């Protein structure tokens, strides 16, 4: 496994309730617990949960993405408790070639963190960072048809539905939202 950062990197964002930071070694078990929840993973990729080894592989991929692009997915930590809630951040959506080139904003939170506005709060911080610090001019976000909670977050961010298409590697119908920054 690619070595995860052991301490906070200069690349972190803060909101009223959340710390968005680079991944740490200690995050593996907490993130594996999120990825083991069927209701969380229902609309992710092919809908299957991930075990600890699969989660470790994903975290290594997230680290490689940061190294290659200079941005990526942040671990979302609840400031009040120090708990890992999930992630939010930016990625290059190579799994959907028809929309490339693009930068996608995405999120995944454990079930215990749903319905509290945390995904929107975290994503708003990432949008501001993408615009103000990274100089990006456009973001997309993609959700599997049926994931209305993610669609609501996209709309709250100011995104508009751009197209519906099929994700080639899974055959699932997805909706692509976009916004100019």
Regions found by a protein language model. Give the residues of each.
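Acyl-donor (CoA/ACP) binding surface of acyl/acetyltransferases
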Residues: 1-43, 73-181
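Conserved GNAT-fold acetyl-CoA-binding loop/helix
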Residues: 39-61, 72-74
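Short loop/turn motifs at secondary-structure junctions and domain boundaries
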Residues: 65-69
């Amino acid at each position: 496994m690619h070595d995860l950062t052991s301490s906070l990197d200069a690349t972190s964002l803060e909101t009223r309730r959340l710390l968005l930071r680079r991944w740490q070694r200690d995050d593996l078990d907490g993130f594996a617990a999120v990825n083991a929840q069927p209701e969380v993973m229902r609309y992710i990729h092919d809908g299957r949960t991930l075990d600890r080894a699969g989660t470790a592989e994903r975290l290594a991929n997230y680290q490689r993405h940061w190294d290659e692009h200079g941005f990526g997915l942040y671990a979302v930590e609840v400031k009040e408790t120090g708990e890992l809630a999930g992630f939010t951040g930016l990625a290059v959506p190579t799994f959907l070639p028809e929309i490339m080139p693009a930068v996608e904003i995405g999120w995944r939170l454990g079930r215990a963190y749903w319905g509290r506005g945390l995904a929107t709060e975290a994503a708003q911080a990432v949008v501001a960072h993408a615009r103000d610090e990274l100089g990006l001019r456009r973001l997309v976000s993609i959700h599997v048809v049926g994931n209305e909670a993610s669609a609501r977050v996209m709309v709250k961010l100011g995104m508009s539905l751009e197209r519906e298409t099929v994700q080639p590697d899974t055959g699932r119908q997805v909706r692509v939202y976009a916004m100019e920054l």
